[in-house]
Amino acid sequence: MTDLVYEQPLNEKIRSYLRLEYLNKQLGNNLNHDHQHRCFYPLFSLCELSERCDYRNEVLKDIERNLLQLGKWQELDHVDSEQIEFYIQSLTQAREQLQRPERCGSQLKQDRFLSALRQRFGMPGACCNFDLPQLHFWLAKPWEERQQDYQAWISHFDPLLTPITLLLQLTRSTAHFDNATAHAGFYQGDSAQALSLVRVRVDAAHGCYPTISGHRNRYAIHFVQFDQQRHSDRSIEFLLATCA
């Protein structure tokens, strides 16, 4: 079997970023493969999240903080200057896009086709052609045309999703995976440095998955046997990365 990576955010900001990243990956998958009406679920979830909360201010603060840190790293010896310059340029461009006045995705509210679908998609089995004949018509279009439509819709969220992808890449890069052992299925750790993300890589052949809890200075990992759905009493070898 293969290694699986599990991630646990230790603050609400990273929790929100991971949710948005997850939806972004689903959007990309739907853009490259024809999943019929299922492509609308991540799109409408993203619309819902962006309407509940305007993430721009938080993301802009994070961009500024990371640009400041990258500038300091740039002055050090033995650093990957090309990689640092890439992130500086990418974050600077993302900041310019995110500073536009309109909220990401707000224009999609004016799309009558999407609005009609969104009202129905929360209802079980409501994608029948007698409920949504306009969806039935759209799905009959050639895949290339639907792909262009989908690209146009999701592009409204690029100013938000692009910097979040970069910020999460930088967060994950703050720690490497190290060997660890969960004795009797349990592992506990602490850190003098404030943490934002705990990452666990474990071989699926162990037949278990981790449940992770904690806050910025302390965390705990319990491994659960999948077949029995109860806490494992075995020693589990895994890889651990604690990201600042």
Swiss-Prot record:
Subunit comment: Interacts with FtsZ.
Record GO biological process: division septum assembly; FtsZ-dependent cytokinesis
NCBIfam families xref list: PRK05287.1-2, PRK05287.1-3
Organism: Shewanella sp. (strain MR-4)
Pfam families, sorted: ZapD
GO cellular component: cell division site; cytoplasm
Family, per entry: Belongs to the ZapD family.
Function: Cell division factor that enhances FtsZ-ring assembly. Directly interacts with FtsZ and promotes bundling of FtsZ protofilaments, with a reduction in FtsZ GTPase activity.
Protein name (database record): Cell division protein ZapD
Record keyword Cell cycle present: yes
Cross-referenced InterPro entries: ZapD, ZapD_C, ZapD_sf
